[in-house]
Design a protein with these regions (language model features):
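C-terminal peripheral helix-coil segments that are non-catalytic and often amphipathic
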Residues: 86-89, 125, 129-137, 154-155, ...
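All-alpha amphipathic helical-bundle segments outside canonical DNA-binding/catalytic cores
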Residues: 117-120, 136-152, 172-175
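Alpha-helical DNA-contacting segments of helix-turn-helix folds
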Residues: 51-59
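Hydrophobic alpha-helical connector segments
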Residues: 54, 68-94, 146-153, 174
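Short secondary-structure transition hinges
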Residues: 89-128, 139, 148
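Short hydrophobic/aromatic patch on the recognition helix
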Residues: 35-45
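Short coil/turn segments at alpha/beta junctions that flank glycine-rich nucleotide-binding fingerprints
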Residues: 19-23, 73, 94, 137
Length: 190
């Protein structure tokens, strides 16, 4: 029950951030959209800024959804490219590029760890599972450890998102990823 309320707040917040922008969204907007009391909001979050740290949860939910929809008979590399495209489409449609730019810059100057880089995230387990499949089938190289492969992949994804942010979201992130990411990740293949 408690996690349902927290998720409801997170979902309402990110919808509003996308619709109105982060700066224009108030805590009262979030409270009204989530249909909760002010006390309930503050029970789960100290401020609106704390909601930015939930982006990793939003993205992990999307990866969990995708893991249930993986196309049959697809090799590991193609599965990774498919998931990358799908998530980047999701990002473009649901998350303002300025929020990513803000989050990335905040993580660079912040002394505490990033929830986006938390190795316990579903995202990293998902990538590792697929890469392990690819390694077992002989599709992926063995010159890097699985951990290095996952890191390489996630760095590539962040590079594309950073490029999108630096261009003010002025290109189709999904299509850009579909075209460039396989070229960037070719080094994973045997």
């Amino acid at each position: 029950m408690a996690s349902d309320i927290r998720e409801k707040i997170i979902d309402a917040s990110w919808e509003l951030f996308h619709e109105k922008g982060f700066g224009e969204t108030t805590i009262n907007d979030i409270i009204n959209k989530a249909d909760i009391s002010k006390g309930t909001f503050y029970y789960y979050f100290r401020s609106k800024d704390n909601l930015l740290d939930t982006l990793s949860e939003i993205l992990d939910r999307e990866y969990e959804r995708l893991s249930k929809e993986e196309p049959e008979g697809m090799g590991a590399f193609d599965k990774l490219m498919w998931a990358n495209y799908e998530v980047h489409e999701f990002i473009q449609q649901n998350i303002d590029y300025r929020l990513f730019a803000y989050l990335y810059s905040a993580q660079i100057i912040k002394e505490t760890g990033s929830s986006l880089l938390d190795r316990n995230r579903y995202y990293f387990r998902y990538l590792e599972r697929i890469m392990e499949e690819g390694r077992r089938s002989g599709e992926f190289t063995d010159i890097m450890s699985l951990r290095e492969m996952v890191k390489f992949f996630s760095m590539g994804e962040r590079a594309l998102i950073t490029e999108w942010c630096m261009n003010n979201g002025n290109f189709d992130l999904g299509e850009y990823s579909r075209k460039l990411f396989p070229v960037m990740m070719k080094g994973l293949k045997r």
